[in-house]
Amino acid sequence: MQSRVLLVTALLVLLASARATEGEDPSLLGLMHGYVQHATKTAQDTLTTVREFPVAQQARDWVTGRFTSLKDYWSTLTGKFSGFWDSTFAVTPTPASEAK
């Protein structure tokens, strides 16, 4: 919810500043250049603010913990069944008469 509010606020600030700078540079290229620079700065500021939220840090920690847990589970599972897979897929030589 808070990230949506920040995004909407950033877009409103961006639109307001674009209107404020319209009178300064009459060329369309200059307007677009200023708009893109301001949009980039606003997006970077918003992302930095969102990254600093405790909820974002908790989400990153949760995902990291779940991924680590999944890797541990997978290694345990493959460790238990590795002997089974090795013996099942052992290559046995075929006699020459059956190979043709």
Curated annotation (Swiss-Prot):
Cellular component, GO annotation: chylomicron; intermediate-density lipoprotein particle; spherical high-density lipoprotein particle; very-low-density lipoprotein particle
Domain of life: Eukaryota
Keywords assigned by UniProt, alphabetized: Chylomicron, Glycoprotein, Lipid degradation, Lipid metabolism, Lipid transport, Secreted, Sialic acid, Signal, Transport, VLDL
Principal place of residence: secreted
Glycosylation sites recorded in the entry for this protein: 94
Protein modification: The most abundant glycoforms are characterized by an O-linked disaccharide galactose linked to N-acetylgalactosamine (Gal-GalNAc), further modified with up to 3 sialic acid residues. Less abundant glycoforms are characterized by more complex and fucosylated glycan moieties. O-glycosylated on Thr-94 with a core 1 or possibly core 8 glycan.
Endpoints of the signal sequence: 1-20
Subcellular location: Secreted
Region (Lipid-binding): 68-100
Site (May interact with the LDL receptor): 41
Role, per record: Component of triglyceride-rich very low density lipoproteins (VLDL) and high density lipoproteins (HDL) in plasma. Plays a multifaceted role in triglyceride homeostasis. Intracellularly, promotes hepatic very low density lipoprotein 1 (VLDL1) assembly and secretion; extracellularly, attenuates hydrolysis and clearance of triglyceride-rich lipoproteins (TRLs). Impairs the lipolysis of TRLs by inhibiting lipoprotein lipase and the hepatic uptake of TRLs by remnant receptors.
Gene Ontology biological process: cholesterol homeostasis; lipid catabolic process; lipid transport; lipoprotein metabolic process; negative regulation of high-density lipoprotein particle clearance; negative regulation of low-density lipoprotein particle clearance; negative regulation of triglyceride catabolic process; negative regulation of very-low-density lipoprotein particle clearance
Name of this protein: Apolipoprotein C-III
Similarity comment: family membership: Belongs to the apolipoprotein C3 family.
A GO molecular-function descriptor: lipase inhibitor activity
